[in-house]
């Protein structure tokens, strides 16, 4: 998401918390794809609605949305592109079954820009009736960040050896 991209690019976010990890052993290269900002519905204008100044709206329903507005323009212009790469030089497992002390989790996730509450919510730990039901999380360490001068289109990334079921390098989901 764009708000996380801002934090990674400015060096504030140095740890990515994930529910999974690749089979690769660190170090390995990762690419940062900046998604489009999520829009939030503010209101819907419907035919016959009266505005505060007494004006009456006429027409089809109009959805009024807001995308946060606090994302810098330089990131907005790079949405839906690959904007950087980094090397994940270590992955620290966060084992929910054994992590009982709040300070231990905070230390393991330091640099993630997430609160303990956000981590617990993301992991789904708040719904667990016991520690043994908690799933693992993984703290991916971000190092050797390289920010692209020009963002790259996702279409420029492919596995050269990939051959789909139809014998081509295209998945057919266009």
Model-derived segments and spans:
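Structured alpha/beta reader/binder surfaces that contact nucleic acids or chromatin modification marks
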Residues: 1-174
């Amino acid at each position: 998401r764009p708000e996380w991209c801002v934090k990674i690019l400015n060096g504030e976010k140095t740890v990515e918390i994930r529910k999974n990890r690749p089979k690769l052993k660190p170090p390995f290269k990762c690419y940062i794809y900046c998604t489009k900002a999520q829009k939030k519905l503010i209101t819907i204008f419907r035919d016959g609605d009266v505005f505060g100044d007494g004006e009456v709206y006429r027409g089809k329903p109009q959805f009024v949305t807001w995308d946060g507005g606090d994302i810098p323009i330089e990131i907005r212009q790079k949405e839906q592109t690959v904007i950087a790469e980094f090397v994940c030089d270590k992955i620290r497992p966060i084992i929910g079954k054994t992590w009982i002390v709040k300070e231990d989790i905070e230390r393991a996730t330091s640099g993630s820009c997430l609160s303990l509450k956000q981590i617990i919510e993301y992991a789904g730990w708040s719904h667990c009736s016991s520690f043994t039901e908690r799933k693992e999380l993984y703290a991916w360490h971000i190092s050797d960040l390289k920010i692209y001068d020009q963002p790259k289109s996702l279409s420029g990334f492919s596995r050269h050896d990939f051959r789909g079921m139809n014998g081509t390098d295209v998945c057919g989901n266009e």
